[in-house]
Amino acid sequence: GAGERVRRRCAAEDAAHRLQRRGRLAGQGRGPGGAILATEELIGELRFFIRQTGPALSPVNAWVLSKSLETLAVRMDRHCSNALAIARRLEGYPGINWVRYPFLESHPQVELARRQMGQGGGLVTFEVNGGSAGGMVFLNGLEMISRSSNLGDTRSIATHPATTTHSRLTEEERERLGITPGTVRLSVGLERVEDILADIDAALGG
C-alpha cells in the first residue's frame, strides 16, 4: 500500500506494493495492480517470468495509478489524521470494548510504532459490545460508511472480519489473532472526521 508515506526508512533491499483495491497508493479501488521495487539482480530474475506470463497493467490502469500518485501525500496525511482522531474518540466510547491503533497512547507497542513510523496509518480496529450480533447491528446501522471487505479507498469502509476476510478460520484461530465476534475493522476515508464519527455514533445508538 502506501507504507512509504507512513513507515520510516529502513534497510530493506526489496519491496512489494499493492497499488489498488486494498492498497492506498491509488486509493480509489478502481482496479488491480502491483509494483516490485528491488535490486537489479532480483528484477533481472523477474523480467524473464514477466515476459513469459505477461502480467502487465492495462494502459488505463497505468494512467489512473500515475495520476493517483500525485495526491498520495495529501491523501495519506488525511487518512492518518482522521484515523488517529477517530481512535482517540472511540476509546471509552459507550458500546465499544476496546480500540486498536498503533499511535494510541494506550497501545502496548506505541513507542515501537513511533520509532518505526511517522504516522499510524488509516486502519482502526475495535470491538463492539454484544459479540457477533452486536457487530452486525452496528454495521447495519451505518449509513455513510460503506460495508465491504475492501480497504484503502477514499471513502470509509467497515468490515466484519469474522464473517468475511477471516471466515474460513476456526473460532479458536480467530481468537489467537485477536479477532473476536464483535471485531470491526474501519478503513478510514477522507470524509470530514465529524461526519465519520456521527455515523458511528448513530450506528451505536447514540
Summary of predicted features, one role per range:
Residues 65-74, 122-129, 185-189:
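Short, well-ordered beta-strand elements within core beta-sheets of diverse protein domains
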Residues 1-94:
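Conserved PLP-enzyme active-site core in the AAT-like
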